[in-house]
Amino acid sequence: MKAHKFLSLGYIVLPLLCSPQTWAQFPRQCATVEALRNGVCCPDLSPLSGPGTDRCGSSSGRGRCEAVTADSRPHSLHYPHDGRDDREAWPTRFFNRTCRCNGNFSGHNCGTCRPGWKGAACDQRVLIVRRNLLDLSAEEKNHLVQALHLAKRTMHPQFVIATRRSEEILGPDGNTPQFENISIYNYFVWTHYYSVKKTFLGPGQESFGEVDFSHEGPAFLTWHRYHLLQLERDMQEMLQDPSFSLPYWNFATGKNICDICTDDLMGSRSNFDPTLISLNSVFSQWRVVCESLEDYDTLGTLCNSTEGGPIRRNPAGNVARPMVQRLPEPQDVAQCLEVGLFDTPPFYSNSTNSFRNTVEGYSDPTGKYDPAIRSLHNLAHLFLNGTGGQTHLSPNDPIFVLLHTFTDAVFDEWLRRYNADVSTFPLENAPIGHNRQYNMVPFWPPVTNIEMFVTAPDNLGYTYEVQWPSRNFSISELVTIGVVAALSLVAVIFAGASCMIRARSNMDEAHQPLLTDQYQHYAEEYEKMHNPNQSMV
């Protein structure tokens, strides 16, 4: 975020209503009775000759309307309710045809560029830098806060959210699509909620909660990477500033304070209620969405755009769980980056020696699974002790964005160090939604997990400015180093003593005649060899 590129936020809301957008769950053009009944979401780019004449920008070679490809490989046994959830084989319960864009073109109608590209022909590379929030200037910090606040209040220009399941999507009369408008930031919250919500099994039946399309499996990192990328691109469009980038919060401080919880950043603690945000912060005005879980689970409805109570936050305030009163240590990150396998069977929250499970926080920083442990990402969420510590609500607290950009930075560093080895990302038998080729729920257009399993600077148009901690040695490693050093010292002393003895012997020989009967003739030793060309070593 360069200061000279800042825009006045007060003058850009109206133009947003007609700006192009890429990241809708379902584009507004597809939220119609006809599109839903036909199962086709291939909007026109420039329909100069009438509707349906330029689907997916086909007239200019940007894309084409194709059948959706959905992963059908088996998932793990954690989910036993096949056929009962709209998120299965995403997004085929709603649409079975969508745009497939060519080259670097992207978007619901192939009207924009893939991440990392810009220009009318999407042939110009672009690279933005995600920096440490605390390293930003006062002007840059204020710009970020105001941009987030604007995203919270600005209706998304291109998409709507479903408020009913697929069997009820056309309403009681069969002709009233059940969609609502929602703000840019609240859509960011909604997508997260939709990925973690329970499976509704029917009236009078308890909803199934052991399902999660974005956590506790290999897709944790790829899903949240795209989630952030979506928000960043949405905000770039909103600000009309392609250089805008999301900073990160380096939560690995080992401290029991939240160093970004100040009124010029994410908001300090309220003087009137320690679980609320200070009135001096704009975030005290924010109201959460997707909090009516009981209604969703018993009535089978979905989260809508209705806002509820304020953000709750009480960093290090959970006195009942001392383990979550202090943030991860810098060395935890260093140790995590030494776990060389991306994921390991059963590809779940009990995997051991799994980098994914380690950075997610279900294993200790060395990769060893321990059911009592909460580390790194999980620990940072729980430390916030409020809205940010509840999975379905956590993105309502804007700290979520900064926490996950740092988690993504760790992921990208791991990809760089280990050359993005996809062989440890399971092709099948991961929890539902977590197979390598699964379309991540509920993103649109469909995008697979493996498409995000790439180094960001080379493939996604962003990089991180971060210094990684070096790893301290453990006690056992220090003992090993000490033993090796001692043995090396003994070897040096022995070698020195041998040299002194040899030198004294050579000095005595120097006083003897050059040729005597005891002289070892070279020819005689050579003749003793069976093969003169064979080494004696």
UniProtKB/Swiss-Prot annotation:
Residues 1-24 form the signal peptide. Zn(2+) A binds at residues 192, 215, 224. One of its GO terms (cellular component) is melanosome membrane. It is a single-pass type I membrane protein. The keyword Oxidoreductase applies. It is an enzyme of class 1 (oxidoreductase). Disulfide bonds join 30-41, 42-65, 56-99, 101-110, 113-122, 258-261, 290-303. Residues 25-480 are lumenal, melanosome. Keywords: Copper, Disulfide bond, Glycoprotein, Melanin biosynthesis, Membrane, Metal-binding, Monooxygenase, Oxidoreductase, Signal, Transmembrane, Transmembrane helix, Zinc. Zn(2+) B binds at residues 377, 381, 404. It comes from the Eukaryota. Pathway: Pigment biosynthesis; melanin biosynthesis. The chain crosses the membrane at residues 481-501. Its cofactor is Cu(2+); Zn(2+). Glycans are attached at residues 96, 104, 181, 304, 350, 385, 472. Its main location: membrane. It catalyses: 2 5,6-dihydroxyindole-2-carboxylate + O2 = 2 indole-5,6-quinone-2-carboxylate + 2 H2O. It is found in: Melanosome membrane. Residues 502-537 are cytoplasmic. PANTHER family: 5,6-DIHYDROXYINDOLE-2-CARBOXYLIC ACID OXIDASE (PTHR11474:SF3), TYROSINASE FAMILY MEMBER (PTHR11474). Monomer. Interacts with ATP7A. Interacts with SLC45A2. Belongs to the tyrosinase family. Plays a role in melanin biosynthesis. Catalyzes the oxidation of 5,6-dihydroxyindole-2-carboxylic acid (DHICA) into indole-5,6-quinone-2-carboxylic acid in the presence of bound Cu(2+) ions, but not in the presence of Zn(2+). May regulate or influence the type of melanin synthesized. Also to a lower extent, capable of hydroxylating tyrosine and producing melanin. This is 5,6-dihydroxyindole-2-carboxylic acid oxidase. It comes from Felis catus (Cat). The lineage of its organism: Eukaryota, Metazoa, Chordata, Craniata, Vertebrata.
